[in-house]
A protein has these predicted regions:
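Short glycine-/acidic-enriched loop or helix-start segments at secondary-structure transitions
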Residues: 3, 59-61, 102-103
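Alpha-helical segments flanking ligand/cofactor-binding loops in enzyme cores
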Residues: 7, 34, 38, 60, ...
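A short beta-strand-loop structural module common to alpha/beta enzyme folds
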Residues: 15-26
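C-terminal binding/interaction regions
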Residues: 76-128
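Short, structured active-site "lid" loops
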Residues: 32-50, 54
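Mid-chain, well-packed structural core segment of small domains
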Residues: 50-96
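Charged helix-capping and loop-helix junction motifs
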Residues: 30-34, 74-75
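Glycine-rich phosphate/diphosphate-binding loop of Rossmann-like nucleotide-binding domains
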Residues: 1-15
Length: 128
């Protein structure tokens, strides 16, 4: 799925910064989540995309970082809501559970949606 996402981003003209992994070997996803989170925190990357099997471990690790608001999205409706209501600055895809076509629809919606503010801003601010 990662290669598909990279090609999707390039096709759409989005800048790409690849934090790994670079092989099919088993890896520890927190290493890559921390690298992505640091990119978000220091302004090198916005927004970010994380991919792992279920997406949960990546999202949990990313959300341990101040200023990172990672949301797990398995369909385009969730992708829209994590932007509109939660101001997600990272989307996490569950690579084992979605196909490339679904990933493309999810990313299209994530990039199209914008934060609505209002009551959602108050909620966002209360969860640092």
């Amino acid at each position: 799925m990662k290669q598909f996402v990279l090609q999707y981003l390039e096709k759409k003209g989005y800048p790409v910064k690849d934090y790994g992994t670079y092989s099919d070997e088993s890896v520890d996803y927190p290493d890559f989540a921390h690298a992505l989170a640091e990119g978000i925190e220091n302004g090198d990357v916005y927004p970010g995309i994380g991919i792992c099997g279920s997406g949960e471990g990546m999202a949990m690790t990313l959300n341990k970082h101040q200023g990172v608001r990672a949301g797990l999205a398995w369909n385009k409706d969730i992708a829209q809501l994590i932007r509109q209501h939660n101001d997600a600055n990272v989307i996490v895809l569950p690579g084992r559970f979605i196909d490339n076509k679904t990933a493309e629809a999810i990313l299209d919606e994530f990039f199209k949606a914008t934060f609505e503010g209002g009551r959602h801003e108050r909620r966002r601010e209360s969860a640092p």
